[in-house]
Amino acid sequence: MASTRDIRRRIKSVKNTRQITKAMELVAASKMKKAQQAAVAGRPYAELMAQMLATLGDRVEEAQHPFLVQREVKTRGIILITTDKGLAGPLNANLFKLVTDIQSPAKYVVVGRKGAQFIARTRRDLLAEFQVSDRAAFAEVKVVVEFMTKQFIDGVVDSVEVIWPRFKNTLVQIPTIAQLLPLRGVQHAVESLQHGTGVSAPRSPAVEAQMLFEPDPVSVLSALLPLYINREVYHQVLDAKASEHSARMVAMKTAKDNATKLLDDLTLEYNKARQAGITQEIIEIAAAQFAAAS
């Protein structure tokens, strides 16, 4: 049995660990709420964009915008959204399984240090690495999107897909892969907006009649599609941030609970060791008294 001094040292260490994991759990919970609030705050913007795209789709034939051009896919472009830090449970590992399943030629743009390390370790083709802060500003995401869309327009990649952890609830984050480019049409973009954010785009004739597009609907559509692409990836980054903080909150809660259980076990072990020591001292005193009396 370990000495009481060793057990006390272990108890102190476990208490410190439990305190740290509890603090990290609370921080992750706060950040998760902020990411969810940011995603909800973007819904009015997404709803208006869906309505505008739906109206434009009715008024113009789909122009040969570079984002709409379908071509043979020889090289896939993948935007991989991961975390910068660890301690997020199996979140990143589940995303890496999706990457491992990709057998066709692909080039990667990675958001997050963990993803960049994985791509480098597995010797995949890394085009660029970006970091996005916890607050995930739109301008930060826009830089990522502009880089990847340029690769698509220049023919470096023939399609663009996004891999990210989709937030379902606090306990469930689903590793997801979705095509971003080329777009499958304006109507598909509208449906993607509605499905991705839960918004609706009511087709009100009165509202549509009030929409004037200058200089012309085709030009507006050409300007609106890049905004749509930026908004899609921005929403996916917010989704990934909520998933990251949720996974970390759950992981830290599990660690805290395990530390509490270990602390209970160590306290019991300490009490047993202390009791054994006291009993041994009593036996030795009694034996000494018996020997003296004899």
UniProtKB/Swiss-Prot annotation:
Highest classification ranks of the organism: Bacteria, Pseudomonadati, Verrucomicrobiota, Opitutia, Opitutales
Subunit structure, as described in the record: F-type ATPases have 2 components, CF(1) - the catalytic core - and CF(0) - the membrane proton channel. CF(1) has five subunits: alpha(3), beta(3), gamma(1), delta(1), epsilon(1). CF(0) has three main subunits: a, b and c.
Pfam families: ATP-synt
Signal peptide: none
Organism: Opitutus terrae (strain DSM 11246 / JCM 15787 / PB90-1)
Domain of life of the native organism: Bacteria
Biological processes, Gene Ontology terms: proton motive force-driven plasma membrane ATP synthesis
Molecular function terms from GO: ATP binding; proton-transporting ATP synthase activity, rotational mechanism
Membrane topology, as annotated: Peripheral membrane protein
Function description: Produces ATP from ADP in the presence of a proton gradient across the membrane. The gamma chain is believed to be important in regulating ATPase activity and the flow of protons through the CF(0) complex.
GO cellular component, one term: plasma membrane
Alphabetical keyword list: ATP synthesis, Cell membrane, CF(1), Hydrogen ion transport, Ion transport, Membrane, Transport
HAMAP family tied to this protein: ATP_synth_gamma_bact
Family that this chain belongs to: Belongs to the ATPase gamma chain family.
Compartments, as annotated in UniProt: Cell membrane
Protein name per UniProt: ATP synthase gamma chain
SUPFAM superfamilies, A to Z: ATP synthase (F1-ATPase), gamma subunit (SSF52943)
